[in-house]
Amino acid sequence: MQRRTFLKGLAGATLVPKELFASPTFTNSMFPETIMNADFVPSSGELHLLYGQLPHDIFGHVFCAEGIPLEENHLSPSGRGAMTRFDFSSDGVRFQRKMIDTPSALMQSQIDTWPDRFKLLGGMAYYSPTMGFVNYCNTAPNYLGDNRFALSYEGGVPYEFDATTLELVTPIGHYDEWQSSLPPWMDALTPDKWLFPQVRTTGHPYFDLNSDECYTINYGGNVSNTGTKNGFIRLLKWDKKSALEGWNIIGRDGKPAFIAATAHSLGVTRHHILVFETAAQVEPLRMIGIRSVYAQQHRTPVWIIRKKDLAANRDTVTADYLELDFDTSDVMCNYDDHENEITLYGQYLGAMDKSEPQYTRDRLLFGGRVSDRLAGYPAAPVDVGGLVRARLQVTSHSVREIVGDFRLIRDDQLFWDMNDPAYRGHFQFPEQFDHIYWAAVGYRKDHVIERVADAYSQYPNRQFTNDSLPQEDLPSALIHMDCQRMSVTDAYQFPKDCVMRTPQFMASPNSSGQDDGYLFTAVVRKHPTLSLGNGKEIWIFDAKNLAQGPLAILGHPQLNFATTNHALWVPKIGPRPADAYRADVGEFFRTRLPKHRRAVRDVIEQMILPRFG
């Protein structure tokens, strides 16, 4: 771009009433600090139309997950989980919102006395020395088919939920089917009575509706690049009714594969599975209060597994290893991999770590310090991001990148803090991607942290240096990428007081085109639209014309969400089948119950076992 695409995105601004952009009063910051708080009680109602007109043919249901920080420095997307379902019809839009009550979240909400209470470690995770780690299960809602839905989380096992009630039903896999992610020496020190083991997995397990197979991973054993000889990645396969199958991934050199950072995304094609190490680092020293930054390395390690090598009589599988020359987090693949060629798309994360929080009293690059109010919100990137396409060639015993097919597009106005994608058939990859929509969260100069800028000062391929970073804020943007041309064909920049993090594609009735439908976006703004409501809003766009602005804006005084993560659209919902899978975890809790204090036993007996036992 370059800049002409950005200007095209603004061309539609004149069609939108200026009230959407108006600020009633002048303040130093246009950032909506209310993104850090939300209600902890259930709510429901019919959304009010604040602006525009809801399309007459919009339909279906959107599920949106969120995180609510519980204290200062708590990374907000990883906060206490909540989920909202939006029901669209010709009569309007209704919503229902509930907390995501995993067993560990229920326990944390009831226990606050030493030694059982949970303590925040490094802003990232809550830990109890007598019980283990909290799993908020709030990364992404997923569809399994047959009215079965699941929530996933990188720091704990996934759970199925009932779409009609929003209540969790069962973990996927018995807790004993998941391996502890702690290093062996730490694992040896954990008490047998632990209720909530530390499990690391991907934020995006893949539920293949064509083959009726589910794939995910379980990894750990190392801490960053320390203790990698004990590291492991287990590829898990599930038929949605039986126990999990698992294979330890081994490289061509005979050494176990490991992940030093995180594994936010999993790639699945017709014949292959791709495990990505993604750009979100959990620094070991952070857990003891040291705020040092381990910068991303401008690389994405990938392990490529052939599905045909997953033998039922073996517990290992060989993978080929490759490093891609960029940092990314959300990755999608064409399901079609004919001639063993794999095409993937993702963000280009320029000099940033999506899991890096702002901490209380952090020094800001442009002067001042982080306020207590915002401590825990993700730090701003220190360079503009982008969008990438990469292609891989898999042979019988190796894999290589088709370097000549690599594409990177960047835009110095639009591509700041590249975040979630949206596409038709969300979390179900099409044979070939034609259109992907992206959220760019934006750039706020008052969120640029000095220690982060220093850590990334020598990061490769920077367009902006620390000395040339913008001195004014750049707002959130909704971006339409044409995958065949690898270009931005349409875009919309939000008013400066808005934060948009979560887009979701909603198909039009009886349509098949990947751009034939609407875009749902969750927006938090400092100055509510037309001065109505609480600033927690839903904006609806025409997928073929983002630049014209929102078709409709909706809100409700009781719709009060915090930092949203991923969303899911489905055309219809129904009750979960009564005879569907359930993991029998009741005995797991009952055998440990006598080893705990009375208050903990009460929570197990009165709140956990009635739901999960």
Regions found by a protein language model. Give the residues of each.
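Beta-propeller domains
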Residues: 6-14, 21-613
